[in-house]
């Protein structure tokens, strides 16, 4: 009877035998989320959402609270690892055509937007110099909305400038949004398992499936262990690697930093925003840089799902990756030549990927039909 139970348990989740390491990032994201919620809870115990005390409370956590520096640095570094994993997860989806499972892809895009909002609110909380000015610049983009802009901005701020009510509501939102992320993640996973995982070939996996446990579960554990090892290495040897030096100074509304920029994981969107000299145009481009992902399920034209056998599409995909990295790099630089030109060129390349992919799909279809 025990053998029957073991066989039943191991066959509860049959998975395609050929899914690669790129399929491990979902479980790594779940590990990141759990780590963020645990460390965030301990930080919230000691944090004070008040503009006079917020910066001091973070200093108090790192200096006086036992193991507080570990909690604070784990929370910061694992946020960066979270975004590395999610960007890799999205890139895998684009490469292997996983967006054709529309419900999963659209729920994933909703997750990405929620995650970005959560990270933005979290970045404001320490009330450092860069936190304050990044919040001022980004929330001020709402004023670009015709007619309603100023009213919406005042409503979000809770006054006529970023002040105590703003910090309080940002803390409340930063605390509640991870629970919304958990709910959306559950929806994402349920929708995925109603149809099952895809595989690198883009073919139906039903003909060759193996139990998820132990084969893929051990592979997941290996990748999670590797990620945690990297996390602990950064924590031990270079905990401030990803922090902005400006954020070690308390927010001062009277002094503007020489170069205002958000965390590295938002730089691609910030670079696109900055490359357009018009405020409304830049805001729309910023929104579109993320929301354009929702168009991919509806613009797929190729006969084959995966890019594995489409060399022209592969060139386009790797151009997108290079473009993403270049925009991130230029957005971290001051607004001056040659960075303005590079930023504008790479922004055009970024959006071109989503326009050229369906056109290239048609071309590849014709090439295949000609060869046949």
Curated annotation (Swiss-Prot):
Binds 2 heme b groups non-covalently. GO terms for biological process: mitochondrial electron transport, ubiquinol to cytochrome c. A ubiquinone binds at residue 193. One of its GO terms (cellular component) is respiratory chain complex III. One of its GO terms (molecular function) is ubiquinol-cytochrome-c reductase activity. It is found in: Mitochondrion inner membrane. Heme b b566 binds at residues 89, 188. It is a multi-pass membrane protein. Its main location: mitochondrion. Keywords: Electron transport, Heme, Iron, Membrane, Metal-binding, Mitochondrion, Mitochondrion inner membrane, Respiratory chain, Transmembrane, Transmembrane helix, Transport, Ubiquinone. Its cofactor is heme b. Belongs to the cytochrome b family. The cytochrome bc1 complex contains 3 respiratory subunits (MT-CYB, CYC1 and UQCRFS1), 2 core proteins (UQCRC1 and UQCRC2) and probably 6 low-molecular weight proteins. Component of the ubiquinol-cytochrome c reductase complex (complex III or cytochrome b-c1 complex) that is part of the mitochondrial respiratory chain. The b-c1 complex mediates electron transfer from ubiquinol to cytochrome c. Contributes to the generation of a proton gradient across the mitochondrial membrane that is then used for ATP synthesis. PANTHER family: CYTOCHROME B (PTHR19271:SF16). Heme 1 (or BL or b562) is low-potential and absorbs at about 562 nm, and heme 2 (or BH or b566) is high-potential and absorbs at about 566 nm. This is Cytochrome b. It comes from Naja kaouthia.
């Amino acid at each position: 009877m025990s053998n029957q139970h073991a066989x039943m348990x191991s066959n509860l989740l049959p998975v395609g035998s050929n899914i690669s390491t790129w399929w491990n990032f979902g479980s790594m994201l779940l590990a990141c989320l759990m780590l963020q919620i645990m460390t965030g809870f301990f930080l919230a115990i000691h944090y004070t959402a008040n503009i006079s005390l917020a910066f001091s409370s973070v200093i108090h956590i790192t200096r006086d609270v036992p193991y507080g520096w570990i909690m604070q640095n784990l929370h910061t570094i694992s946020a960066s690892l979270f975004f590395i994993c999610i960007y890799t997860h999205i890139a895998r989806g684009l490469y292997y055509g996983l967006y054709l499972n529309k419900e999963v892809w659209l729920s994933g895009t909703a997750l990405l937007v929620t995650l970005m909002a959560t990270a933005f609110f979290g970045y404001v909380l320490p009330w450092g110099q860069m936190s304050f000015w990044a919040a001022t610049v980004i929330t001020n983009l709402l004023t670009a909305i015709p007619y309603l802009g100023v009213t919406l901005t005042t409503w979000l701020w809770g006054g006529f400038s970023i002040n105590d009510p703003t910090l309080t509501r940002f803390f409340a939102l930063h605390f509640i949004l991870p629970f919304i992320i958990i709910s959306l993640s559950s929806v994402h996973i349920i929708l995925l398992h109603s149809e099952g995982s895809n595989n690198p070939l883009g073919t139906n996996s039903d003909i060759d499936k193996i139990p998820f446990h132990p084969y893929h579960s051990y592979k997941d554990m290996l990748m999670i262990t590797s990620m945690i090892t990297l996390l602990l290495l950064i924590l031990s040897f270079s905990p401030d690697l990803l922090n902005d030096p400006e954020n070690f100074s308390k927010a001062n509304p009277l002094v503007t930093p020489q170069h205002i920029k958000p965390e590295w994981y938002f730089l691609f969107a910030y670079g696109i925003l900055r490359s357009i000299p018009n405020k409304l145009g830049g805001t729309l481009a910023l929104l579109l840089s993320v929301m354009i992902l929702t168009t991919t399920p509806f613009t797929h034209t190729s006969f084959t799902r995966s890019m594995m056998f489409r060399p022209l599409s592969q060139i386009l995909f790797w151009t997108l990756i290079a473009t993403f990295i270049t925009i991130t790099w230029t957005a971290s630089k001051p607004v001056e030549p040659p960075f303005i030109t590079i930023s504008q060129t790479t922004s055009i390349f970024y959006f071109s990927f989503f326009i050229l992919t369906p056109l290239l799909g048609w071309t590849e279809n014709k090439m295949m039909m000609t060869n046949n």
